[in-house]
Design a protein with these regions (language model features):
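Conserved C-terminal portion of the radical SAM core fold
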Residues: 124, 179-183, 205-268, 276-302
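Core AdoMet radical
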Residues: 93-106, 119-134, 146-165, 176-208, ...
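N-terminal [4Fe-4S]-dependent radical SAM core
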Residues: 27-78, 96, 308-315
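Short Lys/Arg-enriched alpha/beta "domain-start" segment
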Residues: 1-24
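Distinct, well-ordered alpha-helical segments
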Residues: 136-143, 164-174, 233-241
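Short Fe-S-cluster ligation motifs
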Residues: 112-131, 352-358
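Flexible mid-to-C-terminal extensions adjoining Fe-S/redox cofactors in radical SAM and related proteins
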Residues: 306-358
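Canonical Radical SAM [4Fe-4S] cluster-binding loop centered on the CxxxCxxC motif
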Residues: 69-108
Length: 358
C-alpha cells in the first residue's frame, strides 16, 4: 500500500475522498485506511513513523516492512526509476551486481507514487541507475508530474547518453515537467579519460551530443565532475572544454567520492584525498568563474577546503549517510559543515582537523 500520513481527521477525510490510502495516526497507534488494517509495529518502527509530518508518503509491504518515500521536511526526495545503468562507472557508489539485478519499476507504480506527493512540493529528484532506460514509460511518469506537480522543480539525473538519440530526445522533451533541470556527469575533456571512468566505449561522444541537444533547445542543465585519482589532474582542461562548448551550463558541481559499491571495490584506483582533490581543482574553478559559470563543491567537509572557497561548499550528503569524526566533536563550524560519508570515513580513516571560526 502507498499511503499518505495523516493525524488530522479532516485531512484524513480529504485524502480518502480523493481516492488515496491513508496511514492514520491516533495517539501512538497506526492504521491503513480505508482498509482498516491496524499495524503491529516494533517500537523502533513506531518511533520512525511518529517522527513523520502530515502528508509524508509511506509505502508498506508488510506491518514492519515499509519505505518512507517522501518527507516534507527533506530537501532530498527522490523518485528512483531503476537501478540499472548503461554505463559501468568505476567509482559508482552502487555495486555492479546491484545495478544488474534491479529491474525498472513499473510505470503504473511510479505514477501512483507521484500522485501521493503533496501538491506544492518544492523539489523532486528523478534518478536511477539511468532513468531513460525506462524508455517511453518515463514519458508517462513525466506526464504524471506535469499533471499533479506543475510547480515542483525537477532535477533529472542522467548520464545523458540516451539524449544523443534524436528521435527519443525529441519525444522526451515534449513530456518534460515545466521546471526541469538536467544533472549530467562529465568526467573529463576527452573520450580517453571519460570512457575510462564509465568503462563504456563511446559514452563521451554520446554524452557530449546529448548536452549539445539540450543546449540547442534551451533546456537548462548542470554538469557533475566526480573527482577521482584518474581524472583529477585533468580538471582544468575539462573546465576549458565546458566553457568553450557548453557556456550555458548553470553550474559545475565538483563531487567527492562516496566509497561504497564499485567505488570501494576500486578504491586503490580511484581514491584521492579530499585536500588533494581540492588543490587540483583550484585553477579550474577560477577559469569557470571567469567564464561566468557557477561552481559548487559536493561532499567536501569544510576542513578540507580553503576558507576562501567555503561559500562554494554545499551540504549535499543525505542525512542518514552523514558522519563526523571524533575530531569534529568540538568543531565550532559543525552546524554549517556537510560532514563526510560514513562509508568514506570508515574506509579511509581520514584525519579531520576542525578549523576555527573567525
Amino acid at each position: 500500500y502507498i499511503t499518505s500520513y495523516c493525524f488530522n481527521d479532516e485531512n484524513c477525510k480529504k485524502q480518502l475522498v480523493s481516492g488515496r490510502n491513508v496511514l492514520f495516526r491516533s495517539g501512538d497507534e497506526f492504521a491503513i485506511l480505508p482498509h482498516r488494517i491496524r499495524l503491529k509495529l516494533t517500537d523502533h518502527n513506531k518511533q520512525k513513523l511518529l517522527a513523520l509530518r502530515e502528508f509524508d508518503v509511506v509505502e508498506f509491504y508488510d506491518h514492519n516492512l515499509f519505505d518512507i518515500f517522501y518527507q516534507n521536511s527533506s530537501n532530498d526526495n527522490t523518485l528512483v526509476i531503476t537501478n540499472q545503468c548503461n554505463s559501468n562507472c568505476i567509482m559508482c557508489p552502487c555495486s555492479s551486481w546491484f545495478r544488474k539485478r534491479q529491474a525498472c519499476e513499473t510505470t503504473e507504480h511510479l505514477c501512483n507514487l507521484v500522485k501521493y506527493i503533496p501538491q506544492g512540493a518544492p523539489h523532486l529528484t528523478i534518478t536511477g541507475g539511468e532513468p531513460t532506460l525506462h524508455k517511453e514509460g518515463l514519458f508517462d511518469v513525466f506526464d504524471s508530474i506535469r499533471e499533479n506537480l506543475p510547480d515542483t522543480e525537477c532535477l533529472i539525473l542522467t548520464n545523458g547518453r540516451t539524449l544523443s538519440n534524436v528521435p527519443y530526445f525529441e519525444s522526451l522533451i515534449n513530456h518534460l515537467p515545466p521546471k526541469t533541470l538536467f544533472g549530467i556527469p562529465l568526467y573529463g575533456p576527452n573520450a580517453s579519460i571519460h570512457d575510462s571512468i564509465t568503462q563504456s566505449n563511446g559514452s563521451f561522444f554520446q554524452t557530449v551530443q546529448g548536452l549539445h541537444n539540450l543546449q540547442q533547445k534551451g533546456i537548462p542543465f548542470e554538469l557533475r565532475f566526480v573527482e577521482t585519482s584518474i581524472n583529477s589532474m585533468s580538471f582544468l582542461e575539462t573546465c576549458v572544454f565546458i566553457a568553450q562548448n557548453f557556456p550555458k551550463t548553470t553550474v559545475v558541481n565538483i563531487i567527492a567520492l562516496e566509497l561504497t559499491g564499485s567505488a570501494y571495490e576500486n578504491r586503490n584506483k580511484v581514491w584521492i584525498p579530499y585536500e588533494k582533490a581540492f588543490q587540483n581543482s583550484r585553477n579550474g574553478i577560477k577559469y569557470l568563474i571567469k567564464s561566468g559559470i557557477n561552481v559548487s563543491f559536493y561532499n567536501f567537509p569544510l576542513c578540507k577546503v580553503d576558507r576562501s572557497y567555503w561559500q562554494l561548499c554545499s551540504k549535499s550528503i543525505t542525512d542518514y549517510k552523514i558522519r563526523y569524526a571524533e575530531d569534529c566533536k568540538d568543531c565550532e563550524l559543525k552546524t554549517i559543515c556537510g560532514g563526510v560519508f560514513s562509508s568514506t570515513l570508515l574506509a579511509t580513516k581520514m584525519k579531520l582537523i576542525p578549523p576555527k571560526r573567525i
